[in-house]
Amino acid sequence: MLKVSLISLGCAKNLVDSEIMIGHLHQAGMTVIPDAEQADVVIVNTCSFIDSSKEESIGHILEVHQNRGMTKRRKEQKLIVAGCMSQRFSKDLSTSLHDEVDAFIGLDQVTKVAPIIEGLFAQERSAKAGPLTFIEGKSTYIPDYDTPRFRLTPKHFAYIKIAEGCNHPCTFCIIPQIRGRHRSRTQESVVKEVEALVKSGVKEINLISQDTTYFGMDQWEGERPKPSSPVDSSKGNSLCTLLREINRIEGDFWVRLLYTHPAHWSDELIQTIAECDKVAKYVDIPLQHISDRMLTAMKRVTSGDYIRDLLRRMRAGIPG
């Protein structure tokens, strides 16, 4: 039985990817252990959002490689690099980390990690051959409610990734190039996952994606929303309709919204949060800046006046 150790770096969205990988490893009969020194395979799930996170990821990769070379017992250990850095820079890294890494996998391979590992042990490869790369084009994967997953969070709270990718053209961000265009899960899929988590005893549900406020907009018929389009459930499923459906689920729990984009906030969303008693009166909203000049340079499709007015409307419309 193969033993796998996984190092998860970066944000909560990356953590969910790690949970999905572990779920599929368990399903394949592999054992996941915390101690990399005892593992047959080490997976480093990387982050590359900013330079320091890329440096941290490379540091972990080099550390694992150095440690496995310290003893003969670990010389057959495999090192797999996954996550955002692998997805975006695998071609460059295949050269710079030629001798250190056995395989690079991307965001669409999180459900295929077990057969990839089995394949690494099934074939004889010389060190000179360099790492295998399993990344094919832009990412299109999105999880479903029944996707195998092993939660790494404390028992009382969990993350639910309601969408993947991003359509915003922010000049400082490479996420669209890494994770692709925005693609929402179906509302039914998210609701089913919430129901299952609540039944398992989870008290806090954290909804996450690159832009949670854009949820459902990509599925509107006959409409192509803009980066500044407001949440509007009259056009189809949206974050508002999702929150209302979740609020109807029986149980003692609450929902927290993370990674919202200020450009999509509408009066309907403010009212929905105010009216849904299971939705925490808490908002994670990256304003980034208040200077019009800087916001324009960043392509945030907002302005200082817009942000001030939004905060005023939120304070007035959401008690507490």
Where are these regions (language model features)?
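Proteins enriched for Cys/Gly/acidic motifs involved in redox and nucleic-acid/cofactor modification
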Residues: M1-F215, E268, V283, Y306-A316
